[in-house]
Structures are given as structure tokens and as C-alpha cells.
Design a protein with these regions (language model features):
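Intrinsically disordered, low-complexity polar/charged tails and linkers
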Residues: 1-315
Length: 315
């Protein structure tokens, strides 16, 4: 601490020091200890046994008060397209019946062109609040998806309350982002289906054998600092890994790992006759799974992609 104070005094007094900068590099005895891999969030897709009447169920789902320490639905969001003024009047009546309900008009057209009248009213309906609404303030409001509605369910897991986001599509498909384990997913869906059965009169079965993992975010740390430009050159020119490093736009090394289950050696390089592309429009034609990982100066490594947990050790 005294050494730092002396340096600060020299800087304040504009005193020039001839002390050379010391560059410290690890020697041969340095043995790094990598941390365990931590799966932070997963996005899963599930299915119910039949289709869902979205609007009917949405209006009947009850919202619990945020201050009450119990399980239930905290928030629900839907996007509704009204094609006539009568539909808007009926929509306003449903909104007034809901507790803590607001709406945002995303698009409104009411014009007369010749002999035809064009009318369109698109609204995002939001009822209830979640933890994110109380902590964060978003100036630009997010839109919502068609043919589905989203609910945030509070569950109790290991004596702690957690909030789980579930999107329900009219086909019976479920999308659950941001979960850490399958147990919280099953608890949340079980609570939701019980509420639908009790309040709406519809009985659905959750098909547990059809659950798919579409995205996993994981990370670990090397426990030492990384010289990014040198590592970038090694990855790109020695190992031929698709790598990009521009510290002005992103602080880490952005890499792509091409995984193909048919390859005997997984080196992260695409060996297909028709090279796999990173273009979003042509991604469906790829034979390889493209997994992204980012390497930061502090030694932290973030892995993102649509893959199975068994592929982690290979990467």
C-alpha cells in the first residue's frame, strides 16, 4: 500500500521516475487450475398433447399479487390483432376486467380508401409485474410474438422463490428460456397446467419425452490472464479455428467451433464437401453444428450454442 502511495505522490508532483516497467510472465512451474464448467442458463422446447385456445385461456388465467409469498402466475403478456372496431370494444372490456393490466398500441389503421375501409388495431396486453419490471427500467418497450402468449410463474424450489418464463403457442408448443435445470421446468409447467385445468376447464398433458434443448449458455475461467491478440493468432493460423478479435467493438475473442458427429476427430474445423456457412438464411443446410465461444482477457470463457451437454468436454 505504501508503494502505491509513493507512486501517486510522484504522479501528483510530476516527478519523473526512471524505474523500468516490470513484465511478469509465468515460468515452467506455473500450473493453472481451471474452474469447473458452470451451465448458467438453458432454453428448452416442450410440447403439450393438444392445441391451445390462446385468447380464451389468457383472459381466464388469474394473476397473484407480487407481494404475496406464494406460487402462481405473476405476469402474462399477449399480442392481439383486432380487425374491426367491434373487436376493439370487446378487447377493452376484457382489459378492464383484468387486475393491474396495461396495453400498448403497436399499430392502428382506420382509413377509407375509395369504397373500402381499412381497419387494423394491434395491441400488446400486459397484466401483472415481475421481478425484472421492479429492478430494471426499459425505455424502449419490447414487442410480443403472434400465435402465443407468455406467462411468468413464481415457483418455490429449495426454499427459494424463482420466476420461470414460459411461452405457450397455439399448437401446444412450449418455449422455456433462462432455466438452469429440468426440475424447475417441471415444477413450473405442473403449476401452470393445474391453474389452466382449475380456471379454464381444459386438461393438458405435458409430453416429457419430447423435451428438446435448443440453447445452452455455459462458462468457466482459466484463473489467469490471457494475451488476447497472441491467442487469437494461434487459434486462427495454427489451429484454423474461425476466430475474430476486434477490441474496439467486442472485448473478447469471438470463435466458432464446427462440430460434426460423423467426424472421428473433432478439431472445430468444417470438413464437409459443401462448406457450412454462418449465414442465418442457409444455416438449416449445414451438416455441422456451429457453437460459439468467447475468450476474455481475465481468463473467462463463455460457450453459447445449440448443442448437447455431452459435446462440452470435446470443445
Amino acid at each position: 500500500m505504501e508503494y502505491l502511495n509513493d507512486e501517486w505522490d510522484e504522479f501528483i508532483n510530476n516527478t519523473n521516475t526512471n524505474k523500468p516497467l516490470e513484465r511478469v510472465f509465468p515460468d515452467e512451474s506455473f500450473k493453472p487450475e481451471f474452474s469447473n464448467l458452470y451451465i448458467s442458463t438453458q432454453t428448452k422446447i416442450g410440447y403439450l398433447n393438444k392445441c391451445i385456445p390462446l385468447e380464451e385461456i389468457f383472459w381466464k388465467l388469474p394473476i397473484i399479487d407480487y407481494n404475496l409469498p406464494k406460487e402462481g402466475i405473476l405476469k402474462k403478456v399477449i399480442k392481439i390483432n383486432s380487425k374491426t372496431p367491434e373487436d376493439v370494444i370487446a378487447l377493452d372490456k376484457n382489459i378492464t376486467k383484468q387486475k393491474n393490466c396495461t396495453f400498448d398500441v403497436l399499430l392502428q389503421i382506420d382509413s377509407l380508401t375509395g369504397k373500402t375501409t381499412k381497419f387494423k388495431d394491434i395491441r400488446k396486453i400486459t397484466a401483472g409485474v415481475s421481478k425484472k419490471d421492479l429492478i430494471n427500467f426499459r425505455k424502449k418497450k419490447k414487442s410480443a410474438f403472434y400465435n402465443c402468449f407468455a406467462v411468468i410463474i413464481r415457483i418455490k424450489y429449495k426454499n427459494k422463490f424463482h420466476e420461470i418464463n414460459i411461452k405457450l403457442f397455439n399448437t401446444g408448443k412450449l418455449e422455456i428460456p433462462g432455466i438452469q435445470n429440468i426440475e424447475t421446468l417441471n415444477i413450473a409447467i405442473d403449476i401452470l397446467l393445474k391453474i389452466i385445468k382449475k380456471k379454464c376447464g381444459y386438461e393438458y398433458k405435458y409430453l416429457k419425452n419430447k423435451v428438446e434443448t435448443v440453447l445452452i449458455n455455459s462458462n468457466f475461467t482459466c484463473n489467469f490472464y490471457i494475451i488476447r491478440n497472441k491467442l487469437h493468432n494461434i487459434l486462427k493460423y495454427t489451429y484454423n479455428i474461425h476466430s475474430c478479435f476486434d477490441p474496439c467493438s467486442y472485448p473478447g475473442i469471438q470463435c466458432k467451433f464446427f462440430y460434426n458427429k460423423n467426424n472421428t476427430i473433432q478439431n472445430g474445423i468444417c470438413n464437409c464437401k459443401t462448406k457450412c456457412t454462418l449465414n442465418k438464411k442457409n444455416k438449416k443446410k449445414n451438416s455441422c453444428k456451429v457453437i460459439s465461444f468467447m475468450i476474455f482477457r481475465t481468463g473467462s470463457i463463455l460457450i453459447v450454442g445449440n448443442w448437447d451437454e455431452n459435446i462440452l468436454d470435446i470443445i
